[in-house]
Amino acid sequence: MPSILDLPIGTGATGKRKESDSLGEVEVPADHYWGAQTQRSLIHFSIGDDYMPKEVYHAYGYVKKAAALVNEAAGIIPPWKAELIARVADEVIAGKLDSEFPLYVWQTGSGTQSNMNVNEVISNRAIQLVGGSLGSKHPVHPNDDVNMSQSSNDTFPTAMHIATVLEFSNRLIPAVTVLEESIWAKAREWVDIVKIGRTHLQDATPLTVGQEWSGYATQLDDALAFVKHSLRGLYRLAIGGTAVGTGINTPPDFGEKVADEIARLTGHPFVTAPNKFAAQGSLDAMVTSSAALRTLAVALMKIANDLQWLGSGPRSGLHELILPSDEPGSSIMPGKVNPTQEEAMLMVCIQVIGEDNAVAFAGSQGNFELNAMCPIIINNVLHSARTLGDACVKFREYGINGIMLDRSRIDKFVGTSLMLVTALSPVIGYDKASAIVQRALDENTTLREAAVKGGFISAEDFDRIVDPKKMVGDPRHDLKLASE
């Protein structure tokens, strides 16, 4: 058993070194750990500037570590070698080897080049730690040891699931949760402030500002519940299926044991997929997670759209809301302030919806025992989750928390709204109520003036019946029910 050295990351070499694979020798940069297959991918697939997300490689670290430990327990790899692979895998998980993963998203649809990138880097770093020669594949071979009992066809979908679960759990869900809490805080603060409602962009009956914002918070909560629900499918891992789902070249119960080990390492309840043919032939759990992101984007888009309309003005718009002034809004119009947080959120949501369309299309392209559209799916899902999470953080901090009400504007709209006539309809009938509205419009008077002047109702009865505060139900009860 060789001694494991305590060496800093870095080859300490310059120039080129020769590495080989089944197609022959390839020159690779001597200051990097990757090998021949990674270098071939860089040559053949240098397309655009979309790099495989680092989160995928961090997730692969968990896969390689767990597989090594399970292979050791099965007695098919020496303990020292499993320990060595696990040690380097920890460096991968921690992001210490991120610069060693240079591949583009646009590669083989199974993610084989990225799997081999991980295998080669772990192999060469492990070789370095025992004093060997980089590229020798001895004593740790990228295929025979690091990739033992595995295939790209089961490890890449597994890494996709792990990366998505971690992104959702560590970044997206917390960001949406605190945004929702801030919206609930506004709803409670403004629970009793009566405003005019709007449907079809036209005046409608009153509600309170708090009730309106409780709708935003609840819509966001429902979308967040869908995101959390999508985790259930992501917890099921394809590992153990190897090439086509049969588990060829794996020890007994390999998939179950690796999933258990990944669950232990990550703290998330990963399990083996009950049917590996479905887990590898389709990527439906990823499609579902993307659909959840789309639903969240739809909710956020509705909220942002409402806020920018309600903040329009300040003189010729609705201007019920006073939006925070983040920065000057125009290079030509002095003093102009724009709804920049809302616009940024809208663009993020549009991007997410577009990425979901790509994921859905890619998810439909599985052929027989493999869906070979893995890289585009994971790239889009992680990008959507990351941008939504970041947007929620900024939207809360600079868009929601500083919003104030223009009470005079709100009160003016309530006082002049013609839809308050709805309260009269049960008393004088729909037709007479409609006639009051038409008279108020024709004569440019208030609803009260039109009703009294037209002889439809006395002033005293009008004031008793048409009370906006009596037309909003029980706002505090509504908020209590909505938040439970």
Curated annotation (Swiss-Prot):
Residues at the site labelled Important for catalytic activity: E343
Location of the region described as Disordered in the Swiss-Prot/TrEMBL record: 1-22
Annotated catalytic residues: H200, S330
Locations listed in the record: Cytoplasm
Biological or metabolic pathway of the protein: Carbohydrate metabolism; tricarboxylic acid cycle; (S)-malate from fumarate: step 1/1
Keyword Cytoplasm: yes
Keyword Lyase: yes
Catalyzed reactions per annotation: (S)-malate = fumarate + H2O
Keywords: Cytoplasm, Lyase, Tricarboxylic acid cycle
Source superkingdom: Archaea
GO CC terms: cytoplasm
Major localization class: cytoplasm
UniProt xrefs under SUPFAM superfamilies: L-aspartase-like (SSF48557)
Pfam family, one: Lyase_1
GO molecular function, one term: fumarate hydratase activity
Gene Ontology annotations of biological process type: fumarate metabolic process; malate metabolic process; tricarboxylic acid cycle
PANTHER family: ASPARTATEAMMONIA/ARGININOSUCCINATE/ADENYLOSUCCINATE LYASE, FUMARATE HYDRATASE, MITOCHONDRIAL
Cited function: Involved in the TCA cycle. Catalyzes the stereospecific interconversion of fumarate to L-malate.
Record note on quaternary structure: Homotetramer.
Family: Belongs to the class-II fumarase/aspartase family. Fumarase subfamily.
Record's protein name: Fumarate hydratase class II
Organism name: Methanosarcina acetivorans (strain ATCC 35395 / DSM 2834 / JCM 12185 / C2A)
Upper lineage: Archaea, Methanobacteriati, Methanobacteriota, Stenosarchaea group, Methanomicrobia
Gene this protein is translated from: fumC
